[in-house]
Amino acid sequence: VPAVAKSWQISEDGKTYIFHLRENARWSNGDPVTAQDFVWSWWRALQPALGNQYAYMLFPIVNAEAYARGDIRDFAKVGVKAQDDHTLKVELNHSTPYFLQLLDHYSTYPVHRDTIEAFGAPDERGTRWTRPGNYVGNGPFVLDTWRLNDIIQVRRNPHYWDAANVRLSGIDFHPIENVSTEERMFRAGQLHITGTIPIDKIAEYRRKKPDRLLVHPYLGTYYYRFNVRKAPLDDQRVRQALNLALDREAIVRHVTKGGEVPAYTFTPPDTMGY
């Protein structure tokens, strides 16, 4: 779905992406969002010293992995370039049909350079740039309040490119440790939405309140790992037999019971290009 990029083109070989950014895209302080913001943000995300656990999301990009590992030091060799203020060119190692899905992940979002540098070095962790009053973002909401273990409040961002269509004035997020407590609060109308439901409540919602339960596809695969260095699982034939014997339908129906889909391949079925 187009957001800060209004459109994009993909080369015939699937290795080059050209993103066209909206001219009216703004940071929450009014600064324009530019292609260079993405270049700098991805440079920061790949800094070895930052220790970004999601750096691998960018590894399909030419030389991104080598840069993150410190094998090369010249970021100009990494396949991301700002052709002008509103045009971003990304070159991949191979055709990666799910690359656009990777860009849905928050680790690929641009960050505001001036704000980060005002509170420390780009690769420094734990600085105050994310605190209320400091944080500058480019989404539909801005951070207003963050009280640890109490509440996070965000308010509508007047500089958002599509602010006219943002219907909510704000959102309150309540951290709740106990999933049963959270479900009761949702049922009582104290919460408008929850992403966590006790397993034993899912069947009840499906039966009595199906309109209040929505199961989204998740780009991930759950699996059980075995020690294949010890007998009998060191025998490939035994592993193949176990694979054939497992009733995946029964596992998701009677064990996990969370709306999972039986996995017959390691790649999730909703992966683009699969």
Question: Where do the protein language model's features map onto the residues?
Answer:
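Beta-strand-rich interaction surfaces with strong enrichment in secreted/lumenal proteins
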Residues: 7-8, 77-79
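Protein kinase glycine-rich loop
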Residues: 1-10
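Residue-level recognition of beta-strand termini and adjacent short loop/turns
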Residues: 11-12, 82-84
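A short, aromatic/hydrophobic, helix- or strand-capping loop or linear motif
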Residues: 50-59, 114, 256
